[in-house]
From Swiss-Prot:
Transmembrane segments: none annotated. InterPro entries: GreA/GreB_C_sf (IPR036953), Tscrpt_elong_fac_GreA (IPR006359), Tscrpt_elong_fac_GreA/B (IPR028624), Tscrpt_elong_fac_GreA/B_C (IPR001437), Tscrpt_elong_fac_GreA/B_fam (IPR023459), Tscrpt_elong_fac_GreA/B_N (IPR022691), Tscrpt_elong_fac_GreA/B_N_sf (IPR036805). One of its GO terms (biological process) is DNA-templated transcription elongation. One of its GO terms (molecular function) is RNA polymerase binding. This is Transcription elongation factor GreA. The gene is greA. Necessary for efficient RNA polymerase transcription elongation past template-encoded arresting sites. The arresting sites in DNA have the property of trapping a certain fraction of elongating RNA polymerases that pass through, resulting in locked ternary complexes. Cleavage of the nascent transcript by cleavage factors such as GreA or GreB allows the resumption of elongation from the new 3'terminus. GreA releases sequences of 2 to 3 nucleotides. It comes from Roseiflexus castenholzii (strain DSM 13941 / HLO8). Residues 13-75 form a coiled coil. Belongs to the GreA/GreB family. It comes from the Bacteria. Keywords: Coiled coil, DNA-binding, Transcription, Transcription regulation.
Length: 157
């Protein structure tokens, strides 16, 4: 696992803690019951049910390790004390993309919370990384997988 910080909002941390609790309590119990039920059916060497349950167990344990690692490296973003002078993780940024009339508003979050469809972009994404440290009215050129974009920062919250 990585040693770099995992930037999370307070809500993001709470969601991960709730997911971890669910996986450790209910998830493990349900899979253990499925494994035991498959064993009771007899020969497990050719049991698809047993193999499926063991695969799900491995997936669940991997997710538990991943969440524990993220929480251990968590650095909480204080969204309420943000600066409107410079883009940072936790900032809500409104931009205009050159050649378009509409404005886009994104919140810069850590990679574990990124959901572009909800307007949350990672600080590690090309756009998120290019916006960090910039100020209102600055123009930014970003190389993305779909080509070069030119953005003008209109507002930072």
């Amino acid at each position: 696992m990585s040693d770099k910080p995992a930037y999370l909002t307070r809500d993001g941390r709470a969601r991960l803690e709730a997911e971890l609790e669910e996986l450790v309590t209910k998830g493990r119990k349900e899979i253990a019951e499925r494994i035991n039920a498959a064993k009771e059916l007899g020969d497990i060497s050719e049991s698809g049910e047993y193999e499926d349950a063991k695969n799900q167990q491995a997936h669940l344990e991997g997710r538990i390790r991943e969440i524990k690692s993220i929480l251990a490296r968590a650095q909480i973003i204080d969204e309420e004390n943000g600066s409107n002078h410079e883009v940072r993780i936790g900032s809500r940024v409104t931009v205009r993309i050159d050649g378009e009339h509409e404005e886009e508003t994104w919140t810069i979050v850590g990679s574990t919370e990124a959901k572009p469809s909800e307007g949350k972009i990672s600080n590690e994404s090309p756009i998120g990384a290019a916006l960090l440290g910039k100020r209102p009215s600055q123009q930014v050129t970003v190389e993305t997988p779909s080509g070069t974009m030119k953005l003008t920062i209109l507002n930072i919250q």
